[in-house]
């Protein structure tokens, strides 16, 4: 690559015009919920669609975990209009720039939006001509206790080890004349208690963070001029439901439906008080203006837009980013396996019939599989969506002390042992821990062929926090004890294991012996796993840099970290390629973790030393080639982009970010997980970002793996509060703008 003189004049106007995202729309009704359109904000998501003359929407909120750790929907809502829309002029529009969905025929307009500052959903209904008779029905399929089938239990944290007779407990619904209240009330005993007992942690149970006990969640529906008319029953997809129909007392030209949500641990009275408190803060017109301004500001942080062959790819990138932003204020992270936008499971995969409820998602609701979750959150750095990172970082902040209790109880040392399949209370997932365990088996270990000794994915979230500080100075002081604890676990635990085997805690070179270890779920029984070494080296050095850079460092902490660096072994290179480890016992899955030093750990890449070793690994390692794919969480496009392999990156991103199989093009899946597959979209976002912008040291590489034949404009973020806007047209870089201006000298063009 060569560095050219950049032309910066007259760039602001021509680049900024691309900040506003285009609306996405269709002009015919849908067949079923799989043809729904996402809508949301704050921590609320809706699937909105019109079917057989009715407008329907599912409503979901992050954190709505029941006793079994299923992430339950709030319900389904059905709106019927008389007179109805003229289907000849029907349009359903996602107004991206202002964050709302509209259904209209040019006369009638129904607008859905979620307040970004509080958990309130509004449906604004207007007509320019004849007044409307409006019926709104709340539909619920959990009006009685339901015994889960074996397959259905996969929506919970019991998954394949569900006890016989496991129930999804009923909701409580109170239909008053003008207001409907719905709630789910967890009892004192939940899967948390079963997990603690299973994992022999009753001795420290009272110390443990327990987010499920006495959790009450749900909401209240009301609308001016709506009164209760009838109770109805029916069946949608595979689920029977009961509904409560509210109708307008008289025809109206304007109507508003408001649904207020609340989640609270305690009792119903406390929950009801919180709900009422939120309702009192609602100021409809002000809240709508504030919400739309929030979305407008959001889109100005960054953008990607293309014409021609890549237009579909950048459009889907933008649509998926909208879905992620719907949980910007969430107390809980966006789940990789559907997020807030799952739909009826029988429409997910035509090859497998799922006669299950709308609450179903494969791989659980409260268990957060770290290898998958990380791909949802890495793209937020270059997007400049640092606030969206908080729910995921706070997830680990809230649970790491439970993981420290594991280490103390089982092994008598310090450090947070955070497993791969981890619950929202910081313990290993109940079935993955293993229900059939040999006598005397270490109670701290999972009895699972895929997950044993896989502890290093927590370090990626540690790095996200450190990178967020490096990018925009985000205050991460609350996360620093957690990061230290994660590092300390590896140092102390592998010395502990070595001491169990013999008299020495370190090898003959004074290095940790990382055995037994794991390279993802793939290289099991690994000796000095490359992915673990790369993670420990990168996070340790980044934490030292943070401590020194902020001036708040404790010298003893820095000295410890420097000592840890000296104890970390080197990654293994053989035959000119990065190896997954020195040795491993077996290959269990299809993750080529020998490429993790490229991403996420950025030890190799454009502008970095020894890139040929990493390229050789990508192109010639037999397992890396065998495992290559664009599906689901596969990361090959990221590695290709990071290594400047433009042709490879183009081929993979064309498949990865193509339209998904459902009507809304950013609903990918099910892949290896569920639909909409968020780690499919996340890995695609990362790949596109790396094709457009990479940073090595102080240098900013623009278009390092972007095909010259694809016209594109982008704005992305880099470290030190930097934003880069650039355009490629007809194979040439024609516009570049860097803020702050002093970083213009750091830009390297293709």
Residue positions per predicted region:
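Sec-dependent N-terminal signal peptides
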Residues: 4-13
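Acidic/polar-rich alpha-helix caps and helix-coil junctions
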Residues: 281-318, 325-341, 387-394, 398, ...
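The feature captures the catalytic groove of carbohydrate-active enzymes
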Residues: 341-366, 418-480, 491-562, 734
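Well-ordered alpha-helical scaffold segments within catalytic/enzyme domains
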Residues: 300, 323-327, 375-387, 460-473, ...
